[in-house]
Amino acid sequence: MSCKVKICGLKNREDARTAIEAGADYLGCVFFPPSPRHVEPQNAAEVFDMIGDADVLRVGLFVDPSDDQLMEVLNHVRLDIIQLHGHETPSRVEEVRLNFGLPVMKALPIETAQDVEAARAYDKVADRLLFDAKPPKGATRPGGNAIAFDWNLLTDTSWDSPWMLAGGLNVENVKDAIAQSGCKAVDVSSGVEAEKGVKSPELIEKFIAAVKG
């Protein structure tokens, strides 16, 4: 089975179309105003409308959201997965799953083997796990910082929840990342951008081809 690909931080219909036609398995929109990839719910609905009947999942990324913030988006946007990318506890992850009846993907910052072990508190609690690089000190965003971590930290680890790899992935390194980590899915945002917050259709196509080629 080929590795699945999530293109995150999409802001317009054209980039969504490019990702879908290139073979993306997940499209992600960011609902976090400090991010250069933030979109309003109405814009996200337009992005996801491009999926049509394609076998592509809609992912909404949130950072420590309240139930009201989640509901505000869900009133306008159909999501298949809620991605929590903040400091949400395992109990909060479970609460969101129950309150909204949607699968939850929990992003977990990784830098050391201790971080990998700490992530186990979310295994089987979240429907999916997303291992991302720990943001640098002083960073205003928990992800999308174009930073990688040591993928060997995940080699031969076993998880009950399906997991995805993120953090500094790009066309040049994604094959090595898959080989070293053993991941079955990858998530990219900054690695397919021409500039911060602006996707490159060419890089989207090349990234997906590198993963699935």
What are the residue ranges of the model-derived segments?
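Conserved N-terminal beta1-alpha1 strand-loop-helix module at the mouth
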Residues: 1-185, 190-213
